[in-house]
């Protein structure tokens, strides 16, 4: 297990993010998905492969989080290997290259988000197949190296169901054993994490957290 650095969230997840599996983290904009992924990598003390498809990764934010926790910002930045694919084909090449790049020095792989370029394309049928292949590569990496792979996902509004759902829900749901949803609350800075699926933890559990200069913290801290 890889700790998130948040006691209540670790307890919800059964100790942290599972090794050897894909964990999907999804939710609306600005709910803390990227912050959670970055914080987990920061606190791991090892290298992190971060695939940023939306330009959401901020070196300044990582430095702020490290400094606020008494860690060396430069050392923290040096541990993050950043990739910025510009389209779904480049994303495929980047994810494929991770099979050769990941070594025992790495503690985590993050794809943020897996569906950003997917939504920009029109040929949904072929892209669903392409997305499935990329997820299979990520699952291979997770299993081979016994590390967590975090797959961050966006949401869309399903008019028929009258609620938001994760993009490419079936494709990701088939391969992601653990699914965590993040949502906003009316109170500024406060968020809720809901465990929608887990290999051994009860589904539907939830915890509250806040976003601070340190990253993500328990609301009681």
Swiss-Prot record:
GO terms for biological process: DNA recombination; DNA repair. Keywords: ATP-binding, DNA damage, DNA recombination, DNA-binding, Nucleotide-binding. This is DNA repair and recombination protein RadB. The keyword ATP-binding applies. PROSITE patterns: RECA_2. GO terms for molecular function: ATP binding; ATP-dependent DNA damage sensor activity; damaged DNA binding. It holds the Pfam family Rad51. Involved in DNA repair and in homologous recombination. May regulate the cleavage reactions of the branch-structured DNA. Has a very weak ATPase activity that is not stimulated by DNA. Binds DNA but does not promote DNA strands exchange. NCBIfam families: recomb_radB (TIGR02237). Belongs to the eukaryotic RecA-like protein family. RadB subfamily. Transmembrane segments: none annotated. PANTHER family: DNA REPAIR AND RECOMBINATION PROTEIN RADB (PTHR22942:SF47), RECA/RAD51/RADA DNA STRAND-PAIRING FAMILY MEMBER (PTHR22942). InterPro entries: DNA_recomb/repair_Rad51_C, DNA_repair_and_recomb_RadB, P-loop_NTPase, RecA_ATP-bd. The keyword NAD does not apply.
């Amino acid at each position: 297990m890889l700790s998130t650095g948040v006691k209540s969230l670790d307890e919800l997840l059964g100790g942290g993010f599972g090794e050897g599996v894909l964990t999907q983290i999804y939710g609306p904009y600005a709910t803390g998905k990227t912050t959670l992924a970055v914080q987990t990598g920061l606190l791991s003390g090892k290298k992190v492969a971060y695939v940023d498809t939306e330009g959401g990764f901020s070196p300044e934010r990582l430095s702020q989080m490290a400094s606020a926790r008494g860690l060396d910002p430069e050392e923290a930045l040096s541990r993050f290997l950043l990739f910025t694919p510009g389209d779904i084909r480049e994303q495929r090449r980047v994810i494929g290259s991770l099979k050769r790049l990941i070594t025992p020095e790495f503690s985590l792989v993050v794809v943020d988000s897996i569906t950003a370029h997917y939504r920009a394309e029109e040929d949904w049928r072929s892209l669903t197949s392409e997305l499935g292949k990329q997820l299979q590569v990520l699952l291979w990496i997770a299993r081979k190296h016994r590390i967590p792979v975090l797959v961050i996902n966006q949401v869309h509004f399903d008019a028929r169901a009258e609620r938001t759902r994760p993009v490419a829900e079936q494709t990701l749901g088939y391969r992601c054993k653990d699914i965590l949803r993040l949502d906003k609350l009316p109170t500024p800075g406060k968020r809720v994490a809901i465990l929608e699926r887990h290999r051994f933890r009860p589904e539907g559990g939830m915890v509250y957290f806040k976003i601070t200069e340190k990253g993500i913290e328990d609301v009681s801290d």
